[in-house]
């Protein structure tokens, strides 16, 4: 393998569910072997999501590419061997097993822009849209059906038109009080 002058982006396949641990392990191996000058960023593109389970708000992580880790590095024999010896790394994606192909700068730019756009704001796991039918499962309107009029993700609340005695009545409900129909 020849040494290229600039760091390029490569895609690693890792055991699914271990992407973050693999990324951390790579960072530790790089530091331990004093190869920081040959490596750049190690990324697991993901977004924090908020879901409501059992009435409790829980944060979890949604990975855009489950089972994959992006790594910026100069490809040399020593860097290739370092990565291949990290536990739970299955190998590089693209090219031949002994000579992986980097992904294009344009592809990386698209991923990074997408991550920048979503920022650090957690998004709800369940997304509601105006006009969507829902069923109320809690509170005074339990077991009624309704139509979503407005969605407020900041407050996790919905404005819903519920049909009561044949008349459409607007009510405000928490995400926890409704389910998709």
UniProtKB/Swiss-Prot annotation:
Record keywords, A-Z: Transcription, Transcription antitermination, Transcription regulation, Transcription termination
UniProt KW DNA repair keyword: no
Domain KOW: 130-161
One GO CC term, this protein: cytosol
SUPFAM superfamilies in the record: N-utilization substance G protein NusG, N-terminal domain (SSF82679), Translation proteins SH3-like domain (SSF50104)
Recorded superkingdom: Bacteria
Record-level GO BP terms: DNA-templated transcription termination; regulation of DNA-templated transcription elongation; transcription antitermination; transcription elongation-coupled chromatin remodeling
Gene3D superfamilies in alphabetical order: 2.30.30.30, NusG, N-terminal domain
Annotated NCBIfam families: nusG
Subunit structure: Monomer. Interacts with the transcription termination factor Rho and with RNA polymerase.
Family stated for the protein in its record: Belongs to the NusG family.
Free-text function comment from the UniProt entry: Participates in transcription elongation, termination and antitermination. In the absence of Rho, increases the rate of transcription elongation by the RNA polymerase (RNAP), probably by partially suppressing pausing. In the presence of Rho, modulates most Rho-dependent termination events by interacting with the RNAP to render the complex more susceptible to the termination activity of Rho. May be required to overcome a kinetic limitation of Rho to function at certain terminators. Also involved in ribosomal RNA transcriptional antitermination.
Full protein name: Transcription termination/antitermination protein NusG
Source organism: Buchnera aphidicola subsp. Acyrthosiphon pisum (strain APS) (Acyrthosiphon pisum symbiotic bacterium)
Name of encoding gene: nusG
């Amino acid at each position: 393998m020849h040494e290229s002058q600039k760091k390029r982006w490569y895609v690693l396949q890792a055991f699914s569910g271990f992407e973050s641990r693999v990324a951390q392990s790579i960072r530790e191996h790089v530091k331990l072997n004093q190869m920081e000058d040959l490596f750049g960023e190690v990324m697991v593109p993901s977004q924090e999501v908020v879901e409501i389970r059992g009435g409790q708000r829980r944060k979890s992580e949604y990975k855009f590419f489950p089972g994959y880790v992006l790594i910026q590095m100069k490809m040399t024999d020593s860097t290739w061997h370092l990565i291949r010896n990290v536990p739970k790394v299955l190998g590089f994606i693209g090219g031949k097993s002994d000579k992986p192909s980097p992904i294009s700068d344009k592809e990386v730019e698209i991923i990074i822009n997408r991550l920048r756009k979503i920022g650090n704001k957690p998004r709800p796991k369940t997304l509601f849209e105006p006009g969507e039918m829902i069923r109320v499962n809690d509170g005074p309107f339990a077991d009624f059906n309704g139509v979503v009029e407005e969605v407020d993700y900041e407050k996790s609340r919905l404005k819903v038109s519920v049909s009561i005695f044949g008349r459409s009545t607007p009510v405000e409900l928490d995400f926890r009080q409704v389910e998709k129909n």
